[in-house]
């Protein structure tokens, strides 16, 4: 497991945010934005997003096997120092492990994410079939009447939710369209 995550981190350091990540970040200039992501790649932060909740952890970090969410035992790795030797111990004496939510583990950040959704005025959901739980269940925390935009190239069954507008396109194209919908005056100016 350790060597597998060492290999993934090597790929991570060469990854760059796409236009969708940058457009999400650009919304922070006009709105209070919280990003809730299932991805572990930190590309939202690389694009400049400042408030990100990582549901499934972060590939660039390692933690204690005994107490994985204790900040005292979470370490951030760098491209220069990202390989972890198998058997390396955390500060509490347990094995150091990737700061990743493994299959069948609980998702501790789901409660803070649900709290954010309960207070949002607009919910944007990108790149999901709404079949992966518990993240798919976050929509149920949205207050009645709050507009929800779902951006995904594939049709998604949203019958269980009200006020969902689907933008059936990829993340970058969908974020461009959403930006136009949120700022119709500025998108008209750029077209003129």
Task: Identify the role of each PLM range.
Residues 1-192:
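Conserved catalytic alpha/beta core of Sir2/sirtuin-type deacylases, generalized to analogous enzyme cores
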């Amino acid at each position: 497991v350790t060597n597998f995550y060492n290999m993934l981190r090597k790929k991570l350091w060469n990854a760059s945010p796409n236009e969708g990540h940058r457009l999400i970040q650009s919304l922070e200039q006009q709105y209070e934005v919280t990003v809730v992501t299932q991805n572990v790649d930190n590309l939202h932060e690389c694009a400049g997003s400042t408030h990100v909740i990582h549901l499934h952890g972060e590939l660039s970090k390692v933690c204690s096997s005994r107490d994985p969410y204790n900040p005292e035992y979470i370490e951030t790795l760098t491209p220069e120092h990202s390989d972890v030797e198998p058997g390396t111990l955390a500060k509490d004496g347990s094995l150091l492990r990737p700061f990743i939510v493994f299959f069948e583990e609980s998702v501790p950040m789901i409660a803070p994410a649900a709290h954010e959704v309960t207070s949002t005025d607009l919910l944007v959901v990108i790149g999901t079939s709404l079949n992966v739980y518990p993240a798919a269940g976050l929509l149920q925390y949205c207050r009645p009447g709050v507009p929800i935009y779902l951006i995904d190239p594939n049709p998604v069954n949203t019958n269980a939710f009200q006020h969902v507008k689907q933008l059936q396109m990829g993340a970058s194209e969908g974020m461009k369209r959403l930006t136009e919908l949120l700022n119709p005056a500025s998108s008209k100016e750029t077209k003129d």
